Amino acid sequence: MKDYQQAAKVLRDTNLRQGLYDEGAVLMEGVLVNLHGEKHRARRGLENKVFRRGFFSHYEKDVFPKTLALTIDQFVSNGGGDLVEFGFRALINLTCDFAGVDRPQASQSETDRLLSLMRAFALGTTLAHSKDDRDKVRQQVSEALSAFDVEFLQPSVERRMSLIRQVEARGGEEQDLPRDVLTVLLRNEDQIELDGAQLVREMAFFVVAGAQTSIHSLVHVMHEIFTWSDNRSERIETLRTDPMLVQRCVHESARLHPSSPVAVRRAECPVLLPTEQRVETDEQVTIDLQSANQDEKIFGSRASEFDPNRQFDKGISPYGLSFGLGMHACIGRTLAAGVTPKPDTDPVDHQYGIIALIASALLKNGVRPDPEQPAEVDAKTERPNWGRYPVLLGSNPSSNPH
């Protein structure tokens, strides 16, 4: 299915359940994005308690800038490096914060360990598109889950359970507890079906989903920015001083490069699709997100081109269907991509999203592709992602980032 409006209707159809992650059940079985119906509503309702109004603004304006400054200062002092690796390091601590995974050592070696586990989890989320031996990948993911449970999750659970007992004993309030997904799940475990193994998968999924998608989005948008600004000094200077333009670049790149090029749904019962095709129970429907996001009826005759100044009809998201619709719309979309600005939006108070914040920081530090080291696509997956993207930072004899 490639038509934008038809794809949007299918994504909203509650008789079609998530089907993209069936192959990666070793990690994805029973996690939020794979639940359907009442179980999904119950779990999402709880986890939405973390992502209340003000949460995204707090993280974007108060928490993330400190983490980003530490990471980018090291990147600048090194004169650059691999943009993919930088993205992982910039985002891993943030995602652990809102997931509820403690890092008591706050050390380089601890971050390295988390990153190695997260990369293994990422193989589980993309198993349907893997080019490697899938049984070996499943074993690798399973071993990473066990290590994550022992090294990080159980200590985090024990600390939160102790805090929960203390707060409940003195009649305290919810605001006295950590504001993260793990705390919410532990406080409400009697309301949902979530055994020990399932909790490990849920937390691992939050860690990888929060970082991996944003990392790939970051590298894609920087590549698009490098291409769009090539030999145009006025564009480069505007990008360095106009965060609204950078956010539009993020949205436009997300439209062209959804984290998964397709969405998959399975029918819970017989369904008549917008194409007038009938789908029987348990049959699969594939939505071509990449094509739908480039539907010329919606995005114009040059829909396949990168244009951060593109105009949209009312009701059309600038990032297309890349963050999903309906019950499986991305729970962290506002954190990643910010809020779509209105004509009267105040740039000072606006939520740009962490991808735009990182991109702006890189641009202000003179980021540009490393001419001696070409970027490489990720050969381990069929997804069109960058596996390595060397860049330079700091002083540049030319004002051009390309």
Label each residue range with its predicted role:
Residues 288-318, 323:
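Conserved cytochrome P450 K-helix/beta-meander segment immediately N-terminal to the heme-binding cysteine loop
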Residues 16-22, 29-49, 53-64, 103-110:
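Cytochrome P450
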